[in-house]
Amino acid sequence: MKAAEIREKFLKFFESKGHTIVRSSSLVPGNDPTLMFTNSGMVQFKDVFLGTDPRPYSRATTAQRSVRAGGKHNDLENVGYTARHHTFFEMLGNFSFGDYFKHDAIRFAWELLTTVYQLPKEKLWVTVYQEDDEAYDIWAKEVGVPTERIIRIGDNKGARYASDNFWTMGDTGPCGPCTEIFYDHGPEVWGGPPGSPEEDGDRYIEIWNLVFMQFNRDAQGNMTRLPKQSVDTGMGLERLAAVLQHVHSNYEIDLFQNLIKAAARVTEISDLTNNSLKVIADHIRACSFLIVDGVIPGNEGRGYVLRRIVRRAIRHGYKLGRKGSFFHKLVADLVAEMGAAYPELKEAEQRVTDVLRQEEERFFETIEHGMSILEAALADVEAKGGKVLDGELAFKLHDTYGFPLDLTADVCRERGMTVDEPAFDDAMARQREQARAAGKFKATQGLEYTGAKTTFHGYEEIAFDDAKVVALYVDGSAVNEVKAGQDAVVVLDHTPFYAESGGQVGDQGVLANAATRFAVADTLKVQADVVGHHGTLEQGTLKLGDVLRAEIDAHRRARTQRNHSATHLMHKALREVLGAHVQQKGSLVDAEKTRFDFAHNAPMTDDEIRRVEQIVNNEILANAPGIVRVMPYDEAVKGGAMALFGEKYGDEVRVLDLGFSRELCGGTHVHRTGDIGFFKIVVEGGVAAGIRRVEAITGDNAVRYVQELDARVNEAAAALKAQPSELTQRIAQVQDQVKSLEKELGALKSKLASSQGDELAQQATEVGGVYVLAATLDGADAKTLRETVDKLKDKLKSAAIVLAAVEGGKVSLIAGVTPDASKKVKAGELVNFVAQQVGGKGGGRPDMAQAGGTDPANLPGALAGVKGWVEERL
């Protein structure tokens, strides 16, 4: 049974049991800022389990794309060297939100495994938590598993409820026992059942974990039963496929074998058992799906993890002898394997290929450059009789040049050496500490709120008269009262304030009554449907239960709405002008501008920018109404609505039709396109490989920008004594004149250098058969200095020369040495001798070198020392 069929049978089985099939969420978690990547099926349901995200269903099933690389859950270094570690994997799961519990969860699992997948019952073992008699009895008495194949696992991790068979969401919160199902590969494979000394062997393999969220644990460790008990299960598709396909390694299943063969093809390797091919096959899945979900290789956060995975794959290709790009060529093979299950992969195929190709090309340059630095450093260590490479240097290679530590370690091993990894770790820790110190956190992050959700009135109203204070926070802690002058976060039961979301900034405004005035500087989400008003109490005292008038800054909101609506029109126009591959990758919409990041691999031309502006302004002139509808997500997408990167959507979504644009959007917008007024793009540039950024302005901002631009054009025309319409022609004339004058000036400088060279030659002093000259050449630039040195070398035949010039407090130095003398006197060392005395440094070839300095006062003394320096070396 192929992996694709296994996935489909799982989802269809649970659908037949009343479960809603929920699409895989993004690998970038939308509901948990503490999590690097989505690493299990329950991540997208975390708020559902906590009761803060109501859904229209109580049973769900998913095939969730997951990544474990970076952060707490990091399998990267094991990938390719064990049978079951992956960076990317698919987690099959079924979930109950206060619906069924242990009986049905266990019964469903047994039926699917033994009836649908037809696994032999005698091959299945189960574990339960030591104290979970209920689960034990269900397995033994209802399902009929022999008691010798049911194993109780107690607290085996050194604390109460710390067990392989007891699951917790954190130190506090929902938790409960779990039961795990294992498959026995038979006595021909070494290993013992779970809980035995031989449990780490490969005979008994865990294939499914059923978690029963039964309790809530408080800060004191007390356990109370949850009013609504839930189920969260997870089964790795790759592990299950290995069992059903009768192989002992996940890399032997059909999906991986096809990718391994493809990796062998592009690296021109015939040995399909090579571990490097497994690494490459695994990594193409993780890298491709991360890029699909909007992650771009970078130097921090998720982008850095992606870059590390890409570079690890490239390094393994390099180890196989592949010296050119190859990794991006596997995207088409991955699409062939997984595109049917994940259409978003097929849609993004070209973009993923382009991003990987660019990253490869960049890193191959890094490998070549890094290897030269590393080889030089190792040669130096060997020359001194050492066996350990300095960890600080390894960190510099990693941090400055992107050279991975594991590659550095591999090269060292080949030379019989090691890396000082503790020193490397110390350097890395210092960098991380600096990064943490520089981090900023939103005022609402981490606030504990258990009340009702906020009712939002901001689509229709700019003020609400009877808003009640239901929560107050100062310095991250809940309080009953806020005093004048304190910064705080206020939660109301009703509000017209829009909380920052979907790229749109939060509203500003005022919360007030007769005795109190609270200035709202920002509005942020405390939870999905809970709005926090962050600001300062300017007057009075604010207490829980107070009733206030909540009023937004209507002028600021109107300007923000213009920019947000223009963003929708611009997004559509970009797709029309540049192509359907354009996909939003991020945005920031405030009262001043809209900033829009999108997938595209080339700078926009002036003509493309003009066409986008024209399309958007035509839509503005059409003055089309904005029409908002609420409908099921699937219906909206089928109807052509665009879902945007980084957004988490529920099952019911808000669809905005604005002119020719249709998008899912929860933000605030103009009533008609004409309200935008005028649209102008002011910035276009690149922010990462395959990602462009456009900034645009609207309304009075755009009009003011054009007026200021017009004024500058008129000023420039007046300065050049031309009409604005003649400006381009006049500038071309001036440029031609400047080029002609520069040519004349260069000729004059050359003549001057020649004449000065004749004079300077007479100042040279002979030392050991070599003429030594150190002098200042007034008014010369670097080019003139070089030409003069060349003429002097020709004239003097055997010479060591340093010429200097001073301009604007900066020293320029050129050193030249004739070939006969350069074995003993090197120009690079000579110029550095002078440069170090004038606050600079430099370098170059043995026969010609240059340097600069910032301390001209020491120049005469430095030049005077040249003769003695040369004499010492002859």
UniProtKB/Swiss-Prot annotation:
GO function terms (MF aspect): alanine-tRNA ligase activity; aminoacyl-tRNA deacylase activity; ATP binding; tRNA binding; zinc ion binding
CDD domains, per the entry = AlaRS_core
Does this UniProt record's set of keywords contain Nucleus? no
Q: Which SUPFAM superfamilies match?
A: Class II aaRS and biotin synthetases, Putative anticodon-binding domain of alanyl-tRNA synthetase (AlaRS), ThrRS/AlaRS common domain, Translation proteins
UniProt binding sites for Zn(2+): H564, H568, C665, H669
Top-level taxon? Bacteria
What does the note under cofactor report? Binds 1 zinc ion per subunit.
Where does this protein reside within or beyond the cell? Cytoplasm
Instruction: Give TM regions.
Output: none
Q: Which GO terms describe its cellular component?
A: cytosol
Name the Gene3D superfamilies on file: 2.40.30.130, 3.10.310.40, 3.30.54.20, 6.10.250.550, Bira Bifunctional Protein, Domain 2, Threonyl-trna Synthetase, Chain A, domain 2
Q: What keywords tag this UniProt record? A: Aminoacyl-tRNA synthetase, ATP-binding, Cytoplasm, Ligase, Metal-binding, Nucleotide-binding, Protein biosynthesis, RNA-binding, tRNA-binding, Zinc
Enumerate the NCBIfam families for this protein. Answer: alaS
Function recorded in the entry: Catalyzes the attachment of alanine to tRNA(Ala) in a two-step reaction: alanine is first activated by ATP to form Ala-AMP and then transferred to the acceptor end of tRNA(Ala). Also edits incorrectly charged Ser-tRNA(Ala) and Gly-tRNA(Ala) via its editing domain.
PANTHER family tied to this protein: ALANINE--TRNA LIGASE, CYTOPLASMIC, ALANYL-TRNA SYNTHETASE
Q: Which family does it belong to?
A: Belongs to the class-II aminoacyl-tRNA synthetase family.
Q: How is this protein named in the record?
A: Alanine--tRNA ligase
| Organism per entry | Burkholderia ambifaria (strain MC40-6)
* Gene name of the record: alaS
